[in-house]
Amino acid sequence: MKTLGKLIASKLIEVKAIKLQPNNPFTWASGWKAPIYCDNRKTLSYPQIRSLIKLELARVISETFGDVEAIAGVATGAIAQGALVADLLGLPFVYVRSSPKDHGLENLVEGELKPNSKVVVIEDLISTGGSSLKAAEAIRNFGCEVLGMVAVYTHGFPMAEQNFEKAEVKLVTLTDYDQVIEEALRTGYISAENVELLREWRKSPETWGI
């Protein structure tokens, strides 16, 4: 029987929410060369997978952050899934923009929360943690307490772990890079020869492929 992490990893690969191309790397917006591309929004188009992720995010939140009072989704990738989870848990929902609107009230946080609400932030993907932690900071600046963050997937970069620790934000994820590689190898999506390339990238993503 698959563990939850491997099950989620296999589903992300199945619907091509995660693509692995160690011999034909992608170029990220940051300029980094990467053997992986992740777009978890694709899971929203598949009801069974969408529901699985919703249920597991809700379960993890209930078990890890039992006194949660509200859910925040990080724009844009986690807005839909965050709203689904908030609905399942019967909790208020807001979402956090990457930058303020250029008109109106210039809000970073869209929606309403009671002051000092205990909030769990939902993210679809954790890379370095920079944008995710800005969202957590925005919730704190909104006058609320951030209990932690729950994400569908993380690359597992050491720098991300350090950033979350420094920001004092507890992070829990459903699956990660190692489990994606294991499932990709098991299903024949990648070859054994490619595994080392994939692991080398995670060690030094800034310089890999240059």
Swiss-Prot record:
InterPro entries referenced in this protein's UniProt entry, alphabetically: OPRT, Or_phspho_trans_dom, PRibTrfase_dom, PRTase-like
Catalysis performed (reactions): orotidine 5'-phosphate + diphosphate = orotate + 5-phospho-alpha-D-ribose 1-diphosphate
Keywords of the record: Glycosyltransferase, Magnesium, Pyrimidine biosynthesis, Transferase
Task performed by this protein: Catalyzes the transfer of a ribosyl phosphate group from 5-phosphoribose 1-diphosphate to orotate, leading to the formation of orotidine monophosphate (OMP).
Family assignment from sequence similarity: Belongs to the purine/pyrimidine phosphoribosyltransferase family. PyrE subfamily.
Quaternary assembly: Homodimer.
Protein name: Orotate phosphoribosyltransferase
Organism in which the protein naturally occurs: Porphyromonas gingivalis (strain ATCC BAA-308 / W83)
